[in-house]
Amino acid sequence: MNTIGKLFRLTTFGESHGKAIGGVIDGCPAGLFVDMETIERELLRRRPGQSHYTSPRQESDMVQFISGLFRGETTGAPIAFMIDNKDVRSADYDSLSSIFRPGHADYTYFHKYGIRDTRGGGRSSARETAVRVVAGAVAKQLLAPLGIRCTAYTSQIGPVCIPQENAKEYSPEEVESSPIRCPDPNASGLMEAVIETAKKESDSVGGIVDCQISDVPVGWGEPLYGKLHAALGAAMLSINAAKGFEVGDGFALASMRGSEANDQMVAAEDGGISFLSNHSGGISGGISTGQDIRFRVAFKPTPTIGQKQQTVNEQGESISLSAVGRHDPCVVPRAVPVVEAMTWLTLADAYLASRSGRCAHSSLKCNG
């Protein structure tokens, strides 16, 4: 599948070392003014070569819009766009053309399709996420009038995490003040040391991205097979290297009792309701409660490392491999804007669905 979404849809195309990558957004309402500077800012956050902790690959990521815009506004037609690949070194992968790299999609792509693009991972490369960031920036602008806020950040690298007692709602400025997008200064320094150590040892390290969404109205999401947290989970787990997802207190709920886990409610003075906790992460029955939506995404270590590893080639022979190429020692810092982009895409889809299915008689307001 190369398409995500039902009403607000994104289809992506392109490979890591192909001529270009790109996408088509379908379902975006007409009349939305698209601010190109907003798109450029989001792309800059994801772009490689930003710091000592990211891949040295240099890409300008200039977006060319081909259709769907007229004088800066959406027309209701499909919005097609492309980003040229400029800084490719396909020769780095010549020696790997018949080798299955451990932890990559080489083996599975080859056995599924009988052919694979061996240059930089081809279609399975995280280079494709630049397209998601563009589309996410459009979705973000669509939802801007609603005042929804979404902030993702690095909460853990390797064994180092932000202490639970320090966790709070962070601002985008706090997140971006850290080279690895960890808004807790003390934890950020320790995490940077973990990445640095792994890099010096020709190794890599994984981590966790936390995301908080505020001011989503009550009622977004559908029962059963269209649950909002299921859509968010599918979106997050489609990101390269994502291996785990939990919403609210997630797996910790398994060790609680119902008396602890239930988010109890009380009547508010303004006639609405207030929740006494938010263990469910702002979603109940697959539908938003009006509370902050909280979730976490776990990312595995970058599979390409300089240490010698055992693998096989297409002929079925056992060999040893020390990987080459330009790669991040940790994908987490650059995954933060991708998590936000996929969140905006999911919310835009839920927003369009909510406009056709909302009950006109609901008068209870949630006060968080």
Swiss-Prot record:
Keyword NADP in the entry? The reply is: yes
Matching entries from InterPro entries are given as: Chorismate_synth, Chorismate_synth_AroC_sf, Chorismate_synthase_CS
GO cellular component terms attached to this protein's record: cytosol
| Cofactor, free-text remark | Reduced FMN (FMNH(2)).
Give binding positions for NADP(+): R46
- Which principal EC class is assigned to this enzyme? lyase
Please verify whether the record's keywords include Amino-acid biosynthesis: yes
Keywords on record = Amino-acid biosynthesis, Aromatic amino acid biosynthesis, FAD, Flavoprotein, FMN, Lyase, NADP
User: Mind listing the GO biological process terms from this record?
Assistant: amino acid biosynthetic process; aromatic amino acid family biosynthetic process; chorismate biosynthetic process
Cofactor(s) the record lists: FMNH2
Q: Per UniProt, where does FMN bind?
A: R123, S124, S125, N240, A241, G285, K300, P301, T302, P303, T304, R326
Q: Which residues form a coiled coil?
A: none
Pathway, according to UniProt? Metabolic intermediate biosynthesis; chorismate biosynthesis; chorismate from D-erythrose 4-phosphate and phosphoenolpyruvate: step 7/7
Name the catalysed reactions.
Answer: 5-O-(1-carboxyvinyl)-3-phosphoshikimate = chorismate + phosphate
Q: Per its UniProt record, what Pfam families does this chain match?
A: Chorismate_synt
EC number assigned by the record: 4.2.3.5
Q: Which PROSITE patterns match?
A: CHORISMATE_SYNTHASE_1, CHORISMATE_SYNTHASE_2, CHORISMATE_SYNTHASE_3
A GO molecular function for this record? chorismate synthase activity
Q: What does the annotation say about its assembly with partners?
A: Homotetramer.
Membership in a protein family: Belongs to the chorismate synthase family.
Q: What does this protein do?
A: This reaction introduces a second double bond into the aromatic ring system.
User: Could you identify this protein by its name?
Assistant: Chorismate synthase
